[in-house]
């Protein structure tokens, strides 16, 4: 079966907030959701978590909103720095919803685990997976591909699990990125070749594949990158990264195909570098 080839061009480098609500408790035992609602911040409606500070009248504000305020948003009294140890003890026995509950996450967990979960939560908004910091778009997973198709039209997409990624003008000076898309098995993959300037003008290339999908979905696939030519071969095989985690950490840790300019020249022709890309299901 012949490989498709795509050419990747370098991309270059107020109203007063409502009062805190007091839940109506039915029966003698408060439900977990009733207790959690006691900790709602009256400004942002996120949760007030330990260490908990109150105003002189006992009203609470979360740690994110507190530095932005000059008085209590509920009673307009001075904020003060009074520690509410009783509410902190209650917080230790409450399971709080994930901050992305409105997006579909159904997890409830202790406040000590909340921040770590939310950092990895699959319902957290996705950022644009294109390398570089120029695009600040964020949205749901379902909206990623429409965003790429409408806002990044220069990115080529090839169909099939076995294709050739052709990066042009690899001798361009400075930091450069090459990007293309590969569609197979009902999913979309983003292939990235990144050139970085290191010390003393030394340059390194980093090639990696990421799935337009969740971490769990990414575990179902493997990818192989291969430089092949002039009776030489250089191969890298790994699990694709999810765009949820991105590729910055993998590149920083060299957890991808890494080679320098001297290696690149062994496989390049007329300043262009072809990388064979194969996606397979595990």
From Swiss-Prot:
Show the GO cellular component annotation of the record: cytoplasm; cytosol; nucleus
The pathway where this protein functions is: Protein modification; protein ubiquitination
MF (Gene Ontology): ubiquitin conjugating enzyme binding; ubiquitin protein ligase activity; ubiquitin-protein transferase activity; zinc ion binding
Region annotated Disordered, chain positions: 1-28
Q: Do the record's keywords include Cytoplasm? A: no
Write out the entry's keywords from A to Z. Answer: Metal-binding, Transferase, Ubl conjugation pathway, Zinc, Zinc-finger
Q: Which GO terms describe its biological process?
A: neuron apoptotic process; proteasome-mediated ubiquitin-dependent protein catabolic process; protein ubiquitination; ubiquitin-dependent protein catabolic process
EC primary class: transferase
Start and end residues, zinc fingers (SIAH-type): 93-153
Q: Which CDD domains does its entry note?
A: Sina (cd03829)
Query: What's the protein called, per UniProt?
Result: E3 ubiquitin-protein ligase Siah1
The record lists the organism as Danio rerio (Zebrafish)
The lineage is:
Eukaryota, Metazoa, Chordata, Craniata, Vertebrata
